[in-house]
Amino acid sequence: MRPSDLGPGLFLGDDVQIGEGVRFGVHVVVHAGTVIGDGCELQDGAIVGKPPKLARHSAAAGRTVAPLELGAGAVVCARAIVFAGARIGAGAILGDQSYVRERAVIGAGSLVGRGTAVDNDVVIGERARIQTDVYVTAFSVIEDDVFVGPGACTTNDDTMSRHGPEYALRGATLRRACRVGGGAVLCPGVEVGEEAFIAAGAVVTRDVPARAVAMGVPARVVREVGEADLLERWR
C-alpha cells in the first residue's frame, strides 16, 4: 500500500488499474488488484477491494476471491466498503456507508442505499433500487428493476447456525420488477414472483406468486397487482 498524488490522502495497493477520468475524495483506500473503470467516483473515506476476513467456521471460508471490478461510471459513496471479488456494474451507485461483500454482483444502473449490506454471493440485476438500511443475505438473487424498501431484511438459515457443513444456505429470490415494502422480513429460500408487491412490515414465510399483493404476519395474498401498477406503465 502506497500514497498517491491522484487524490488527497489516497492509498493504492499493488497492481491497481485506474481508468480515465476517475475522481477520488479524501482518504480513499484502494486495495491490491482493484480495477476501476472510466469515470468512476470514489468519495471520501471509501475502501474498495478489501480482502475478506472470515471466521474459522464461516461457510465462505477457504474460497479464493478475484480482484474487485468497478464498471464505468460507478459511484462508491462516502465511507462505503466494497470487498475484493465483487463486481459492480456500469453506473451503479453504492450509498454512504454501504457494505458489499466478496463475490457479490451488482448490475448496471442499480442503487444500493445508505447503510445497506449486500452479503457474499448475492446477485443483483440492473436498475434495482435497494433503499436505506436493507440487509441482503448471502445467496440471494434480486432481478432487474426490483424495489426493496428501507429496513427490509432477508434471511438464509432456518437453523440460526445450528447445522453441519453440508447444510445449504438459501437466500431470497426476488423476481423482475417485484416490490418489497419497508421493514419486511423474507424467510430463508422464499421466492417473490415478477411484479409482486410485499407490504411494509410483512413477514414472508412462503413463496409469493407473480403479481400478487401480500401483507401481514405471516404474509397472505390479498389481491392481484392491477394493470395500472405494472412497471411498463411507469417507464
Feature locations, PLM:
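Short, basic/aromatic-enriched C-terminal tail that caps enzymatic domains
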Residues: 221-235
